[in-house]
From Swiss-Prot:
It comes from Candida albicans (strain SC5314 / ATCC MYA-2876). Belongs to the FES1 family. This is Hsp70 nucleotide exchange factor FES1. GO terms for cellular component: cytosol; endoplasmic reticulum. It is found in: Cytoplasm.
Length: 284
């Protein structure tokens, strides 16, 4: 409160130097002082705005953007479950007449809330949201929505076995498609594969990756040397596969080694640990 008092005095006097020194005030303290709504109330009100039939699309977008900013805070992200807001969000996402713009924002909210957050992963797992995300991720006619849905799925299943088990049961592995050459799409697919591998690699998954020619695809990304983010992610997945005892064939090793030679000139821009681990994975 003392900092808030100093900030208020500096604000009223127009003392810019003092304002810069003090920094921004704590939002919760401001709300307590001026009687504004707390963040939990703001979250609930945002969803009410989106559910209303009397509100413009623009205002609904603003409400969801504000909601996403709030849930960047871990406590607020966990409050989605505490406030029982997951199901309303999924209901809005699932409605056919919900504008694409809102669906994109909701997928972003899901991905942000569950990212590296076990509590929110568990809460989201209690909903039917994953099924809806997988359906949206299959629609390549709405690229931005597809991309955000893939982001949300990857965030949800990363290092979370119950979520991955549901993903597998819902045949989410069918989302892996190497035919689309859009860089952003490829990056989303590689992120999804990395999230899958964060839960381990059994014989069935090894066989599916063999059949899908994953190592060949990773090698092709390295050989193209066109996008540093894609190269970095591909090297990371090669490293993950090696750590999980994936047995690369001689042909796979040859292709990946050739790709590594192509990208070695980018070493200053790449994760050096992943580069070295990828070399080790295919050297023997």
């Amino acid at each position: 409160m003392e900092k808030l008092l100093h900030w208020t005095i500096a604000q009223q006097s127009g003392d810019k130097a003092a304002l810069e020194k003090i920094g921004e005030p704590d939002q919760k303290a401001l709300n307590q002082l001026f009687g504004g709504p707390d963040e939990a109330t703001l979250m609930k009100e945002s969803i009410k705005v989106v559910e209303s039939t009397d509100v413009s699309l623009e205002d609904k977008e603003i409400a969801l953007e504000n909601f996403e900013m709030l849930i960047e805070n871990l406590d607020n992200a966990n409050n989605i479950g505490n406030l029982k807001l997951w199901n309303p969000l999924i209901d809005i996402l699932a409605k056919e007449d919900t504008p694409v713009e809102l669906k994109v924002l909701i997928c972003g909210i899901i991905g942000t809330a569950v990212q590296n957050n076990p509590k929110s992963q568990e809460d989201f797992n209690e909903t039917e949201g994953l099924s809806e995300l997988i359906e949206l991720a299959q629609d390549d006619k709405k690229f931005e929505l597809q991309s955000k849905a893939l982001f949300a799925i990857s965030s949800f299943i990363r290092n979370f076995q119950p979520g991955y088990a549901k993903f597998e049961k819902l045949q989410g592995l069918k989302l892996i498609n190497f035919d689309n050459k859009n860089n952003k799409y490829q990056l989303r697919i590689l992120s999804l594969i990395s999230s899958i591998l964060s839960n381990g690699l059994d014989d069935s998954l090894k066989a599916q990756f063999k059949e899908a020619k994953l190592p060949h695809y990773l090698a092709s990304v390295l050989n193209e040397d066109s996008n540093t983010s894609l190269v970095d992610k591909s090297l990371n997945i090669v490293s993950q596969l090696n750590q999980l005892n994936y047995e690369f064939s001689l042909e796979e090793k040859y292709e990946i080694n050739r790709g590594i030679q192509v990208v070695e000139g980018l070493s200053e821009k790449l994760n050096i640990d992943d580069l070295n681990n990828a070399k080790q994975a295919t050297s023997s």
